[in-house]
Amino acid sequence: MENRWQVMIVWQVDRMRIRTWKSLVKHHMYVSGKARGWFYRHHYESPHPRISSEVHIPLGDARLVITTYWGLHTGERDWHLGQGVSIKWRKKRYSTQVDPELADQLIHLYYFDCFSDSAIRKALLGHIVSPRCEYQAGHNKVGSLQYLALAALITPKKIKPPLPSVTKLTEDRWNKPQKTKGHRRSHTMNGH
């Protein structure tokens, strides 16, 4: 019988970013209580030797599973040290992989207070309106003009520590163009 391969998307992430993300998840699960209902599975609870941890996030009758891996093949760069993250959406026996932006939007639908388009309607009906969005990573579009006007009136309050964003976890820090401070150039290069 032949080997049958399954391919899945795993974002290469450096281990310090994974470590920070895990500690943020644990903080909001056990200390702040904002991630109520989330389940953290340690590496020793998984039968798979490459799984470093799993975070199960209930989304109604479905769930989002964020799995971190270690001991993977290293990438083409020195800093690709064999760490990675995969994101799955599961409902009963069906599962599919999702990208980090969609994962953040799904988390935002079910968790964390938000000052969004519905705030305008709630304010008109006399309901209590949350003055800010706690989970900015869940927004990837510009709000309506009414929303932007209301948001301009209310100054956002920074949350310490920040909420665990899947997009932030998987972003590519290494291939971003470097920003340099000032105009430091060699005098011989520009002729002055």
From Swiss-Prot:
One of its GO terms (cellular component) is host cell plasma membrane. Processed in virion by the viral protease. Highly phosphorylated on serine and threonine residues. Its main location: host cell. The modification Phosphothreonine is found at residues 96, 155, 188. The record marks 150-151 as: Cleavage in virion (by viral protease). Residues 151-164 are annotated as: Multimerization. It is found in: Host cytoplasm; Host cell membrane; Virion. Residues 40-44 are annotated as: Interaction with host APOBEC3G. Changing residue 133 to L: Complete loss of viral infectivity in non-permissive cells. One of its GO terms (biological process) is viral life cycle. It is a peripheral membrane protein. Disulfide bonds: none annotated. Residues 14-17, 74-79 are annotated as: Interaction with host APOBEC3F. Residues 151-180 are annotated as: SOCS box-like. A motif (HCCH motif) lies at residues 108-139. Keywords: AIDS, Host cell membrane, Host cytoplasm, Host membrane, Host-virus interaction, Membrane, Metal-binding, Phosphoprotein, RNA-binding, Ubl conjugation, Ubl conjugation pathway, Virion, Zinc. Induction: Expressed late during infection in a Rev-dependent manner. Residues 164-192 are annotated as: Disordered. Residues 54-72 are annotated as: Interaction with host APOBEC3F and APOBEC3G. It comes from the Viruses. Vif-defective viruses show catastrophic failure in reverse transcription due to APOBEC-induced mutations that initiate a DNA base repair pathway and compromise the structural integrity of the ssDNA. In the absence of Vif, the virion is morphologically abnormal. HIV-1 lineages are divided in three main groups, M (for Major), O (for Outlier), and N (for New, or Non-M, Non-O). The vast majority of strains found worldwide belong to the group M. Group O seems to be endemic to and largely confined to Cameroon and neighboring countries in West Central Africa, where these viruses represent a small minority of HIV-1 strains. The group N is represented by a limited number of isolates from Cameroonian persons. The group M is further subdivided in 9 clades or subtypes (A to D, F to H, J and K). This is Virion infectivity factor. It comes from Human immunodeficiency virus type 1 group M subtype B (isolate N1T-A).
